[in-house]
């Protein structure tokens, strides 16, 4: 993504500078039918600029506006933080909350849910939580089972916790290192 002429940070910078974004700009089309807008480390730097931007909570929505009618779903993969980019992603219609099956991630879930409530009150009252998806699970260990039970027990009565989980995979870690 570092060599690509257009990334998500390029598009968001255009939106922040009130420049038009042609529909489809920056979208890469994969042969398997999945399209994506790549991002790179520049996006983290752009987040600092968002703080001083008017309508800063909706810049990402503005970027995606021209393309949203071409898709049934647009998935936004956010970093595990509660910064301005995550708030921008919460301008979506719905959110699916992935949570690593680890203690600190489970603790961070409460903060994220508080942020979602604040976004509902102040920015996007229609935001719906689709559910919680447990990731990096390892049902073979007591610890993995305890975290699974902890999240289901604490949130399962209020928010759907999907039965399907994404297991821990060494292969996934290897692939992410390649890019």
Can you say where each PLM-predicted feature lies in the sequence?
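P-loop NTP-binding core
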Residues: 1-179
């Amino acid at each position: 993504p570092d060599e690509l002429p257009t990334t998500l940070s390029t598009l968001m910078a255009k939106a922040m500078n009130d420049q038009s974004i042609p529909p489809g700009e920056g979208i890469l089309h994969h042969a398997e039918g999945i399209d994506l807008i790549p991002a790179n480390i520049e996006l983290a730097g752009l987040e600092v600029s968002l703080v001083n931007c008017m309508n800063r909570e909706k810049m990402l929505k503005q970027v995606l506006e021209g393309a949203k009618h071409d898709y049934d779903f647009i998935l936004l993969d956010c970093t595990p933080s509660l910064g301005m980019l995550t708030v921008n992603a919460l301008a979506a219609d719905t959110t699916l909350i992935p949570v690593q099956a680890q203690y600190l991630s489970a603790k961070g879930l409460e903060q994220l849910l508080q942020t979602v409530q604040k976004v509902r009150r102040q920015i996007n009252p229609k935001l719906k939580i689709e559910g919680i998806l447990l990731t990096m699970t390892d049902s073979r260990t007591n610890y993995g089972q305890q975290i699974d039970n902890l999240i289901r027990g604490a949130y399962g009565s209020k928010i759907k916790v999907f039965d399907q989980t994404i297991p821990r995979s060494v292969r996934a870690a290897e692939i992410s290192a390649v890019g």
